[in-house]
Amino acid sequence: AATVANNGKRVAPHLVEGIYANNDQGGLGDLIEKKETKELNQVNISEEDMALIKQGFYQVVNGWSGLTTGRTIAQGAMVSISAKTGTAETFVNGGTSAINTNVVSYAPSDRPKIAVAVVFPHNTDLSSTVSHSITRDIINLYNQQHPMN
């Protein structure tokens, strides 16, 4: 999702933009150490193809067809989210299957600031949208701390 949000630029995943001290009230204080973004490479893709991929990510959450598998991500979202959902079935010893549901996303859709990936391993209820809720809640929480509108 981050590569799509960055128009094909692959960056190393990171959790924080910096390390901060606390202020007198226990809130966010001064920046102690900034974590730089490390660019890995650029994917060789045309602008037209990248635009199609971005439109696909947007439609997964915001479209109205029967293929709009991530519509519940938008319910209660504070900003526009683009995402791709997925399901992977694996088999462990003895032939027992395990189903993992996944969401990769970025927000806001038009000016991405955050990319989020959620994996829900061994999901026994494929009608569950818990990975969608987790995705939306992470993005909403980030937006509360770092307004993206």
Q: What is each PLM-predicted segment?
A:
Residues 39, 47-48:
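A structural-propensity feature for long, helix-poor, extended segments
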Residues 1-39, 57, 61-149:
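Active-site beta-strand/loop architecture of penicillin-binding DD-peptidases
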